[in-house]
Amino acid sequence: MTTKTRFAPSPTGFLHVGGARTALYSWLQARANNGEFVLRIEDTDIERSTQAACDAILEGMNWLGLTWDEGPYYQTKRFDRYNEIIAQMLAKGTAYKCYCSRERIDALREAQAANGEAQKYDGCCRDLPARDTDEPFVVRFKNPIGGSVVFDDHVRGRIEFSNDALDDLIIARTDGVPTYNFCVVVDDWDMGITCVVRGEDHINNTPRQINILKALGAPIPEYAHVSMILGDDGAKLSKRHGAVSVMQYRDDGYLPEALLNYLVRLGWSHGDQEIFSLEEMKQYFKLGDINKAASAFNTDKLVWLNQHYIKSLAPEYVATHLQWHMDDQKIDLSNGPALAEVVTALAERAKTLKELAASSRYFYEDFAEFDEAQAKKHLRGVALEPLQLVQQKLAALTEWTVEAIHQAIEDTATELDVGMGKVGMPLRVAVTGAGQSPGLDITLFLIGRSRSEQRISKAIEFVADRINS
């Protein structure tokens, strides 16, 4: 039987890290078993579902590279199918109309709470004969009485629920809109889902859904309920820990490979290995290797992984993601080096693409003034002679290459009998406006000959003015 999994988010908010991890695990379960992955949008909460959230979910999935084989399916477009099944269940007696008022239900719950009993529907309308009336009603599923629901969870092992602890679930509201738990069952059945991967907050839904599947004569999928993600302080993950939308991580300068690698390790492991390509994830992933314990979100670990991927992935590929940040920071690339060359030069120092973009501006744009602290330290009177001599040697070069530039800087230091820093630091501030850059040879090469010479001249004027002031 072909493995078929699904990711079924509700579009009441953006795709967050918890949902993204669930999507990844479900996607990997399909890919690791040469199966199929379905994307389903569970939008039956009409009041809270938004198109913006739907779009953000799709954008996040695409950015992560979690491609789907079917879908996206929308539950709101399948109401006719749900109502068809509800009608069949009413006719077969596996569901019934409940006419109990809100007041009666509230009073029942209050009495049960006062008596220390579990709050559940008492089956008042369960065996009433059909009636022809205009009274409002909900449709309830006739949950089995007695016995238990048992399933083997890939993550948690054997789980058992007593049917007596389950009440008769509402499967259609008074307005005729089918409920979440019912739609999920019909969808999983119709779409041939063989394995459901979802958060542990759905465990209590599982016995109810299994009972409905049995009533429909539908096959029961396998289940894997993954633990929640906590902040590094042990509290439930919130925005202050990093529970932001997936696309916010893109905006903050993370590569999808880094986020995927981080998320897969947030509860799953394969020996002591930390770095996983997507192909390796597919090769090694098993649901049974997911840890039952909650996992703590650690932003420092994510940053470390991001640094690794910025340095190790092909510069041309990193440049395709860096382009978004250059555009976002309004850096015009038309007058400067190829972006992949900048990635090669700056990757070693960069923690994020956002940071990398900001630090690359001087390759493409002239700066209005030197960094005040760096200029005060390095563009002093003592810097005038090194700057003038290195300017002469650079101007005399017959070719503008990294090797030739390096030799010119080295020859300047030798001729003046000073350390490289006495030449390099004033030159660095001169051409970048700041105190940090890659090697000066590659920096000047990428800035370009004309622009480098202009900036050195500007720095010489700056130093001369300081001497004369």
UniProtKB/Swiss-Prot annotation:
Q: Does the keyword Metal-binding apply?
A: yes
Give the cofactor note text.
Binds 1 zinc ion per subunit.
Give me any GO biological process, just one. Answer: glutamyl-tRNA aminoacylation
Gene3D superfamilies linked: 1.10.10.350, HUPs
Q: Which cofactor does it need?
A: Zn(2+)
Q: What is its EC number?
A: 6.1.1.17
Instruction: Spell out the subcellular localization from the entry.
Output: Cytoplasm
| Keywords, sorted A to Z | Aminoacyl-tRNA synthetase, ATP-binding, Cytoplasm, Ligase, Metal-binding, Nucleotide-binding, Protein biosynthesis, Zinc
Which domain of life, per UniProt?
Answer: Bacteria
**Which GO cellular component terms are attached?**
cytosol
Cleaved signal peptide residues:
none
Q: Where does this chain mainly localize?
A: cytoplasm
Please give the subunit comment from the record.
Monomer.
**So what family is this one in?**
Belongs to the class-I aminoacyl-tRNA synthetase family. Glutamate--tRNA ligase type 1 subfamily.
User: What function does this protein fulfil?
Assistant: Catalyzes the attachment of glutamate to tRNA(Glu) in a two-step reaction: glutamate is first activated by ATP to form Glu-AMP and then transferred to the acceptor end of tRNA(Glu).
Q: What is this protein called?
A: Glutamate--tRNA ligase
